[in-house]
Amino acid sequence: MQFPEIPPLDDALRPVLQAAIDDKTKPLGALGRLEALALQLGLIQGTARPVLRRPTVIVFAADHGVADAGVSAYPAEVTAQMVQNFLAGGAAINVFSRQHGIALEIVDAGVRVPLPAAPGLVNCRIADGTRNFANEPAMTPEQAAAAMTAGMARVLRHAQQGCNVIGFGEMGIANTSAAACLMQRLTGLPLEDCIGRGTGLDDAGLARKREVLAGALARHADAQAPLDVLATFGGFEIAMMAGAFLAAAASRMVILVDGFIATAALLVAQRLDPNVLQYCVFTHCSHERGHRALLAQFDAAPLLALDLRLGEGTGCALAWPLLASAAAFLNEMATFSGAGVSTASP
């Protein structure tokens, strides 16, 4: 499978951008991490006057066969029910997107029950959910490739419409199990560091989840390469996000990274092209146990720590105002020379 080439950021611009930030009418470093964020935006866009256009969140929804193994506190039909809630405008991501003027797109990547056509729903179905990876690979290599291609296509469509800042959310019962297996196999960390309670498993449910995932990892010990791991354990929504990350970076878009599931999809993308990380803004550290360890793999410093464990792209929407503020101060704050303000004494 061919992936778009991701250009590395131009480090020669770093001192130029840092000088522009330091010349603003404030003590050096006084805006803290907002300054690092502004620097990253400038590097991605190659300018000291970055402009963020048409912020968008794409929510990919799909079902997982491993849900049949009892690894989630909720039944699989909740995936389709939540998609209907998204379309009705009643979910958290709908509320936060409306609040902040973020465009929202809902993609059926492979919900178990086919959904009727509806305004706002994009049909990219690969199949009626994945197979149960406790027994067999979740998808074929061809299905994984088709899902990644579909994710790339959605991003390119938005890029062509002028969007240059994008985030990805997901909905899929049992997708924390898929993410945990992806994380364990691609990082080599102990399964215990990758697994959490998901949507609220009790102790018995967590023990069941641990047993199922350990068995699946042992059964599929031969799956080692990133695309093989994705096809074996992933979900259609995760594969679409992995492709979407690659396409967004290749299009030099600012990428908002949500929670555990999205970061697991990014892990696949990063194993395929490490340059993807340069375009990523990590929006938050979630309550899901594996997320903190996965962020550490990327040496990432997330913007928010709100104990979120919802997914949907909610972290992207909540962090968006910080990006807007970073771009605004870089564009609009006066400089010491322009405002006639004295700099600090040597």
UniProtKB/Swiss-Prot annotation:
CDD domains: DMB-PRT_CobT
Entry's Gene Ontology molecular function annotations: nicotinate-nucleotide-dimethylbenzimidazole phosphoribosyltransferase activity
Pfam families: DBI_PRT
InterPro entries per UniProt: Nict_dMeBzImd_PRibTrfase (IPR003200), Nict_dMeBzImd_PRibTrfase_bact (IPR017846), Nict_dMeBzImd_PRibTrfase_N (IPR023195), Nict_dMeBzImd_PRibTrfase_sf (IPR036087)
Active site positions: 312
Superkingdom, natural source: Bacteria
Reactions catalysed according to its record: 5,6-dimethylbenzimidazole + nicotinate beta-D-ribonucleotide = alpha-ribazole 5'-phosphate + nicotinate + H(+)
Keyword line: Cobalamin biosynthesis, Glycosyltransferase, Transferase
Family, as annotated: Belongs to the CobT family.
Free-text function comment from the UniProt entry: Catalyzes the synthesis of alpha-ribazole-5'-phosphate from nicotinate mononucleotide (NAMN) and 5,6-dimethylbenzimidazole (DMB).
Protein name per its UniProtKB record: Nicotinate-nucleotide--dimethylbenzimidazole phosphoribosyltransferase
Origin species: Cupriavidus taiwanensis (strain DSM 17343 / BCRC 17206 / CCUG 44338 / CIP 107171 / LMG 19424 / R1)
Lineage of the organism: Bacteria, Pseudomonadati, Pseudomonadota, Betaproteobacteria, Burkholderiales
